[in-house]
A protein has these predicted regions:
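Charge-dense, helix-prone N-terminal extensions
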Residues: 1-164
């Protein structure tokens, strides 16, 4: 446990100062909602994974890139909430558009046989079939943070209710 705490503190020091409080807030949200945390050093910083403890399925990852800190969401339940997705700002919608299409959903080619299919969603009348690993890969920034937190809260609530 001490090693994980040390890794978490090292992760926070790599986060831009203006985003540390938000990263810490999300960390607490995940932990308080029954997620396990796995932190691994990478060449570009850290990969911080949050998994729903009972199902062991990933909910989110913090990922460092040259452009800064990104949050990858596995929004299996929130993806079905059309109102939530329609309220996304244009920058987040652009990130979804930019994500590669899911090869399994579009049947355009072979994907890894163990790969879970991506997300098929309709946002503002536009249909997307995106890879689950890049569909919801969003930059952490002041404009995006409230929307990211909203998606996470809905996803955690839906996963908890699905267990009940």
């Amino acid at each position: 446990m001490i090693k994980q705490q040390e890794l978490y503190e090292a992760f926070l020091t790599r986060v831009e100062p203006e985003h540390r409080a938000f990263a810490a807030e999300l960390h607490e949200l995940f932990v308080n909602n029954g997620c396990t945390v796995e932190i691994n050093p990478t060449s570009s910083g850290f990969l911080v994974s949050y998994k729903f403890a009972s199902t062991k399925k990933a909910v989110a990852n913090f990922v460092f890139r040259k452009s800064g800190l990104l949050l990858r969401l596995y929004a299996d339940h929130a993806s079905r909430d059309e109102a939530l997705l329609s309220a996304l700002p244009e920058d987040l919608l652009a990130a979804i558009r930019k994500a590669p299409d899911c090869k399994r959903l579009t049947r355009s080619g072979a994907c890894n046989p163990r790969c879970a299919a991506g997300y098929e969603v309709i946002i503002r009348g536009e249909r997307f079939q995106k890879c689950r690993y890049n569909a919801y890969l969003f930059p952490i920034c002041m404009e995006n943070n409230p929307f990211l937190q909203s998606i996470i809260e809905r996803e955690l609530t839906a996963r908890t209710q699905a267990e009940a």
